[in-house]
Amino acid sequence: MDSDYSFSLTTFSPSGKLVQIEHALQAAASGGSAIGIKAKNGVVLITEKKLHSLVDVTSVQKISMITENIGLVYAGMGPDSRVLIKKARKESEKYYKQYKEKIPVLQLVRELASIMQEFTQSGGVRPFGVSLLVAGFDEKGPHLYQVDPSGSYFAWKATAIGKNMVSSKTFLEKRYSDDLEIEDAIQTALITIKEGFETQLTEFNMELAIIGKNQEFKILTPAQIKDYLLNL
């Protein structure tokens, strides 16, 4: 059985799997839903924030700014995401000090993927139990990437991670258009995440962020999110 090989990070099971990576992928897949949509003029990130009723929702943040033109959202284990966010910011600072310009989105994605892949084959560590959606805008335009615990990364027009990723991707396939503007992408993201929501969608149980050509990466306030919800 594959489970007999889960004791080792670097031992393949008879079916050709690295079981610890499978566990990490499952941890990411069981996390809160997160969706990314690339529009003609920017990128939208949205995620649910499902917390215990006694938790102060303002103390939990799932979407993070890395640089002025790059941000990310995670699905999976929060503590693991904090490590990767710290490393992403450090790599961005190092790039700026060396080249005196902002790190390209793909360059940062490759750095993150390399770090995550290294944790699938090194002794004394385990894979990161998170998947990331990285959104950014650089001289080549808007970008949306997904990075998985295995170190794999993909460019997407629209995608989802977390517990409702299959149904969300199916929904996005029906609604996505290459002609989407950023405002349309926000509405599409809200409708998509609402489809998988078990309770009423409010400005307090979700996060929403945008990045555009002349717009720094911005995490919207609850009041701004409420305005969009009223127009659904």
Swiss-Prot record:
Residues passing through the membrane, by range: none
Keywords: Cytoplasm, Nucleus, Proteasome
Intracellular or extracellular location(s): Cytoplasm; Nucleus
InterPro entries: Ntn_hydrolases_N, Proteasome_alpha, Proteasome_alpha-type, Proteasome_asu_N, Proteasome_sua/b
PROSITE patterns, alphabetized: PROTEASOME_ALPHA_1, PROTEASOME_ALPHA_2
Family annotation (Pfam families): Proteasome, Proteasome_A_N
NCBIfam families hit by this protein: PRK03996.1 (NF003075)
Record function comment: The proteasome is a multicatalytic proteinase complex which is characterized by its ability to cleave peptides with Arg, Phe, Tyr, Leu, and Glu adjacent to the leaving group at neutral or slightly basic pH. The proteasome has an ATP-dependent proteolytic activity.
Protein name: Proteasome subunit alpha type-2
Source organism of this protein record: Dictyostelium discoideum
